């Protein structure tokens, strides 16, 4: 029996608005599972496997070409809202080798104030360094924890900075002595002061991208510095993207309030807003914050973004080089939602299906060209 496209989309809209009844949710899941079973791709879990369902939605529901990508992205966003665990049941297209390139993982290097380098990838769990009044511990889940040493609470003897660096294909989380948490994205570095005792300035320096959950301390502002760009907060959740190869610096606010300063320019952000520093000017726009922090949640999430911008993020995470056979392809726009923890072929397949480009993987290089007419 042919699927009623409008009815399926009505169910998706209800999912997105959180108004779907349990019966309607079950109906949508049943619709998906029937098609998955037909192709012998049948998840065992009662909850729909997010990426498999996303691909099925994209293939099964046909809409006019001009709005197909946006509707597909909306459907994928719904699955993110539901919070379904990610599993992949995808069949790569002929142009993409499924055995090509694996995703990034928890990798980082800790550079101590004296220049000593400690590979957090290779170091055993437990205490890995002690400095003045600071103990540094590696946990078993990609997390580095700074704590004030016992009986040294409130002392301010430590000085200098440590640096945590993630390579391409790496990410790491840091917990500071004040309880603040920082997630560091691929190819980024974070410079941290050793002195986090009471009265000391809470100031870190970022190159690359990081998500911050800052502990609220009214008398001690927390400042994130990226070159001439600074974000000052008291306690809030926000994301800063400040890669050297990007044309701008973006600060996205999820909770609380932050003040963004660059030179003589300054703006205050409210939740749901993003500042953009480009060519010395700061602009502010309303955004879907899920896109800004999707990387931290384990997803790629792009909404009508330029292909060149998308591939910068892809290259950092998979540690690959990207070559455009035609510079005009850099301006192509795409929507894509997929897990970051799968081979690169999954993302490339999605983009091939939704656009007019094709990808060729040669070693650690991705070649992008125009799709050949059938």
Enumerate the predicted regions with their spans.
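Amphipathic alpha-helical interaction segments
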Residues: 23, 39-41, 80, 154, ...
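Membrane-interface anchoring determinants
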Residues: 2-11, 25-29, 33-103
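Charged, low-complexity interaction regions
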Residues: 19-20
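Regular secondary-structure segments
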Residues: 12-16
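A residue-level detector for the "anchor" residue at the start of short, highly conserved motifs
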Residues: 67-74, 85-374
């Amino acid at each position: 029996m042919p699927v009623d496209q409008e009815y399926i989309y009505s169910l998706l809209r209800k999912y997105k608005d959180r108004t779907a009844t349990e019966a309607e949710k079950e109906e949508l899941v049943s619709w998906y599972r029937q098609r998955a079973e037909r192709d012998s791709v049948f998840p065992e879990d009662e909850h729909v496997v997010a990426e498999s369902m996303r691909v099925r939605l994209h293939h099964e529901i046909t809409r006019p070409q001009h709005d197909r990508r946006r509707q597909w992205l909306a459907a994928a966003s719904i699955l993110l809202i539901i919070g379904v665990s990610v599993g992949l049941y995808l069949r790569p297209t002929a142009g993409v080798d499924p055995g090509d390139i694996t995703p990034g993982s928890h990798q980082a290097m800790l550079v101590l104030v004296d220049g000593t380098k400690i590979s957090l990838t290779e170091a055993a769990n437990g205490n890995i360094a002690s400095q003045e009044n600071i103990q540094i511990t590696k946990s078993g889940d990609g997390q580095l924890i700074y704590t004030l040493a016992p009986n040294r609470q409130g002392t301010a003897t430590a000085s200098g900075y440590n640096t945590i660096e993630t390579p391409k294909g790496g990410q790491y989380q840091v917990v500071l002595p004040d309880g603040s948490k920082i997630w560091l994205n691929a190819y980024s570095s974070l410079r941290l002061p050793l002195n986090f005792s009471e009265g000391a300035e809470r100031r870190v320096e970022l190159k690359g991208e990081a998500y911050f959950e800052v502990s609220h301390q009214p008398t001690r502002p927390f400042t994130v510095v990226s070159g001439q760009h600074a974000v000052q907060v008291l306690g809030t959740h926000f994301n800063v993207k400040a890669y050297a190869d990007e044309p701008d610096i973006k600060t996205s606010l999820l909770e609380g309030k932050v003040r963004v300063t660059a030179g003589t320019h300054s703006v205050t952000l409210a939740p749901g807003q993003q500042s953009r520093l480009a060519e010395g000017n700061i602009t502010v726009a309303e955004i879907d914050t899920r896109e800004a922090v999707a990387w931290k949640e384990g997803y790629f999430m792009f909404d009508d973004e330029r292909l060149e911008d998308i591939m910068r993020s892809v290259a950092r995470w998979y540690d690959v080089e990207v070559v455009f056979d035609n510079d005009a392809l850099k301006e192509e726009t795409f929507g894509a939602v997929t897990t970051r923890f799968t081979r690169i072929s999954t993302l490339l397949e999605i983009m091939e299906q939704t656009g007019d480009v094709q990808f060729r993987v040669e070693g650690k290089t991705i070649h992008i060209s125009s799709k050949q007419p059938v």
